[in-house]
């Protein structure tokens, strides 16, 4: 520590370098998540949906033979596919954020920042 309880200039410079690197890595991660296509399928694979790593809906694929099913079955399949895609996307985002923030002990809500 330098005088007046402040870190020395070298430590401060290093902290700014780390902060800048984290900012660059975070932007790269944001771009990567935005360009991902994560698939979710209904249990019978009649409905498939794709969302980005940021959980934005991208596309839907419906097997033609499900269109003859009753309304409740179609709704159930759509919901299953959306839930699975969302779960995969959320897991992927958390893993990537942990990779970015691991070891920094930022204690971000919703993210496991431990070094386990």
Swiss-Prot record:
HAMAP family: DNA_YbaB_EbfC
Cellular compartments annotated: Cytoplasm, Nucleoid
Annotated NCBIfam families: DNA_YbaB_EbfC
UniProt name for this protein: Nucleoid-associated protein P9215_00191
Domain of life: Bacteria
Organism expressing this protein natively: Prochlorococcus marinus (strain MIT 9215)
Subunit: Homodimer.
Record's signal peptide: none
UniProt KW Cell membrane keyword: no
Family: Belongs to the YbaB/EbfC family.
Cellular component annotations (GO), alphabetically ordered: bacterial nucleoid; cytosol
Main location group: cytoplasm
Keyword Oxidoreductase: no
InterPro entries to which the protein is assigned, alphabetical: YbaB-like_sf, YbaB/EbfC
Role description: Binds to DNA and alters its conformation. May be involved in regulation of gene expression, nucleoid organization and DNA protection.
């Amino acid at each position: 520590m330098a005088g007046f309880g402040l870190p020395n200039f070298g430590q401060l410079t290093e902290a700014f370098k780390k902060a800048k690197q984290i900012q660059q890595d975070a932007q790269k991660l944001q771009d990567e998540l935005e360009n991902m296509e994560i698939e979710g399928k209904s249990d019978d694979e009649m409905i498939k949906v794709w969302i980005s790593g940021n959980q934005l809906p991208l596309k839907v694929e419906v097997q033609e033979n499900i269109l003859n099913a009753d309304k409740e079955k179609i709704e159930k399949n759509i919901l299953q596919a959306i839930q699975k895609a969302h779960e995969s996307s959320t897991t992927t985002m958390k893993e990537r954020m942990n990779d970015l923030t691991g070891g920094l002990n930022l204690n971000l809500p919703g993210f496991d920042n431990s070094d386990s």
